[in-house]
Amino acid sequence: MVVVAAVVVAAVAVVVVEEDRIKTKYINDIVWKKISGLEFDNQNAELTFSKRLARENRWPQWYALDVIEEYRKFLYLLQRAKHPVTPSIEVDQVWHLHLTYSEFYWEDFAKGMPVKPHHGPTRGGSDEDNKFIDWYAKTLESYEQIFGNKPPVHIWPSKDERFRANQSWAWIDVSKHFIIDRNAGYVYILFIIFLMILVATIF
């Protein structure tokens, strides 16, 4: 039992040392220091970057802040992974918004970076789909290798979920339209039909 316990302790120690080594490697990188030092929220602004991100995506504030932190890691992967990288949909929303703050993006972040951080959307077609699926899978692998832990699934879903078929994204003015979950919507429709039949029966 003593030997087994000693082996377990040694294994845990090795894992901790390895995690510390990985963390030390990227934390001491000048590229990471610049990225981690980016101030996304101007506290003098009534509508800050994170509040705008939360509002445009209908996210709670805490989630918007979490995604921004994952976006920092994506920016680092973009610079240090030895292959093209692809963000999750959530992280991509931060990237899109960051690009609209053009001076902040190109002067405060991109200037002097080893890799020019251009955003290249898909040109469509199965070849492009397969390319981005491959890049995303490699991005998840590099995330774990560089940061020493798996990416959080609530921000970085699996490649199958990230690229599931029949996705349809659109900007909607919620002051003019209701948003109803499709699965729940069927229940609402059946309920309304039931009420209509009930009313017709009574009257």
Which residues make up each language-model segment?
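Acidic, Ser/Thr/Pro-rich intrinsically disordered cytosolic tails and loops
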Residues: 1-6, 11-203
